[in-house]
């Protein structure tokens, strides 16, 4: 699966996603829609910093709730995805969809 195909699949299965960025193992953007760009990966870095303060390993996923949107970040098989969704998006489904997209990308490599 190409990164562009992964984005298309995500947008097809979830009408609640507004923006998505997919990242390779080095942290480079491989595909994005909605203008998230490389800075979006910082959400995982911030979550890792918080985990480290608590003596925990790096996070696999995180969610940030804002009044007007939810932000989701996921790591899977060395890849990462960050998405902005409507505030009423179902977190479990968004995490599942992002993880499946990353698995598809990892399997194609």
Residue ranges and their predicted role:
Residues 1-25, 29-109:
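Non-catalytic interaction/Regulatory regions outside core domains
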